[in-house]
C-alpha cells in the first residue's frame, strides 16, 4: 500500500500540465519537478510558551529514603515520674553471707536475772598466814584400835602364770581381809601395810612378783640349782579401801613354787602398820555424833 502511494506521487510530480494563465506562445516548463529532498534548514526561533496544562494525577508514594548518619548524643533528659510498684518477683537463690556489720548501740538494761549455778572451783589460792594456836585436843590414844593381818600357806605346787596364786592354807586372818578363794588381800582401812613372802622352789626356776591393783610392786627371780631353795621378798605400801594385793608368776615356765606339807611350806603374809590419821579423825567425829 505504501509503495503504491509513493509511485502515484511520483507520477503526479512528473506530469507537465500548463498553467491556466500561460500566454500563448510562451514556452511551457513544469513548475514543480519532483527531486531528491534537500538538506534540513537551520532551526527556527523558539516559539512562545504555551499556556500551563492541567494538573496531572497524584503519583504513587516514593520509596523510603536511606537512614541518615547517627546524630550526636543529646543532653540528659529530666527524670520521669515514678512508676507503679511491679508485681512481687520469684524468690532468688540464697546469697553468700555478708560481712559482719558494725556494732549497734547498747540496748536498755534488762531485768535482773536469777542467780546462776555455782561455777567450777577456782585455782588454789596462796597460803594464808598462820593462825592462832587452838585449844588443847583430847587424847583418844588406844580408844580406837583397827586390826588387819594375815599369814597363809599353799598346798599345791607349780601354779599357773599371770594369775593370782591361791594360798588356801590359812594360818592367821585377822579381820578376814584375805580371801583364800581368790588369793587376794582386800584393804579395809587406809594406811601403811607391810607384805612379805617366802617361797620354796624346786625343779624349776622361779619368777614371782607382788601385785598391787594390777601393777607389780616387787619381783623376785631365783634359779633352779637342782636343790630346794627359798625366794623371799617384802615391801611397805600405802593402801586405800578396796585396794587389792596378791602374788603371781610373771614369766612362762618359771613357776617353780614347791609345796610339801610334810616338811616345806611357802608363805604369804601381810599386816597393817598404822591407820591414816585423817581416817581416824573422821571415825572419832562420827562417834561423837
Curated annotation (Swiss-Prot):
Keywords: Collagen, Secreted, Signal. One of its GO terms (molecular function) is identical protein binding. Residues 143-279 form the C1q domain. Residues 48-61, 78-91 have a biased composition (Low complexity). This is Complement C1q tumor necrosis factor-related protein 7. Residues 36-134 are annotated as: Disordered. SMART domains: C1Q (SM00110). One of its GO terms (cellular component) is extracellular space. Residues 63-76, 93-102 have a biased composition (Basic and acidic residues). It holds the Pfam family C1q. Residues 1-16 form the signal peptide. Residues 38-139 form the Collagen-like domain. It is found in: Secreted. It comes from the Eukaryota. InterPro entries: C1q_dom, Collagen, Collagen/C1q_domain, Tumour_necrosis_fac-like_dom.
Amino acid at each position: 500500500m505504501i509503495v503504491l502511494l509513493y509511485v502515484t506521487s511520483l507520477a503526479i510530480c512528473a506530469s507537465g500540465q500548463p498553467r491556466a494563465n500561460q500566454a500563448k506562445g510562451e514556452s511551457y516548463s513544469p513548475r514543480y519537478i519532483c527531486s531528491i529532498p534537500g538538506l534540513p534548514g537551520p532551526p527556527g526561533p523558539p516559539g512562545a510558551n504555551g499556556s500551563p496544562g492541567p494538573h496531572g494525577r497524584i503519583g504513587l508514594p516514593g520509596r523510603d529514603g536511606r537512614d541518615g548518619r547517627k546524630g550526636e548524643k543529646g543532653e540528659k533528659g529530666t527524670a520521669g515520674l515514678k512508676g507503679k510498684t511491679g508485681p512481687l518477683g520469684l524468690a532468688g537463690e540464697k546469697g553468700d553471707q555478708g560481712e559482719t556489720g558494725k556494732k549497734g548501740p547498747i540496748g536498755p538494761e534488762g531485768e535482773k536475772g536469777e542467780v546462776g549455778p555455782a561455777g567450777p572451783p577456782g585455782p588454789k589460792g596462796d597460803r594464808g598466814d598462820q593462825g592462832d594456836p587452838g585449844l588443847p585436843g583430847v587424847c583418844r590414844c588406844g580408844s580406837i584400835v583397827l586390826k588387819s593381818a594375815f599369814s597363809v600357806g599353799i598346798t599345791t605346787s607349780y601354779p599357773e602364770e599371770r594369775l593370782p596364786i591361791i594360798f588356801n592354807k590359812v594360818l592367821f586372818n585377822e579381820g578376814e581381809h584375805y580371801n583364800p578363794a581368790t588369793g587376794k588381800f582386800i584393804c579395809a582401812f587406809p594406811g601403811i601395810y607391810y607384805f612379805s613372802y617366802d617361797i620354796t622352789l624346786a625343779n624349776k626356776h622361779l619368777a614371782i612378783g607382788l601385785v598391787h591393783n594390777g601393777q607389780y610392786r616387787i619381783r623376785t627371780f631365783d634359779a633352779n640349782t637342782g636343790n630346794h631353795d627359798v625366794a623371799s621378798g617384802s615391801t611397805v605400801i600405802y593402801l586405800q579401801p578396796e585396794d587389792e594385793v596378791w602374788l603371781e608368776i610373771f614369766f612362762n615356765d618359771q613357776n617353780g613354787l614347791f609345796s610339801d606339807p610334810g616338811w616345806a611350806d611357802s608363805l604369804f603374809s601381810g599386816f597393817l602398820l598404822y591407820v591414816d590419821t585423817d581416817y581416824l579423825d573422821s571415825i572419832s567425829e562420827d562417834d561423837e555424833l
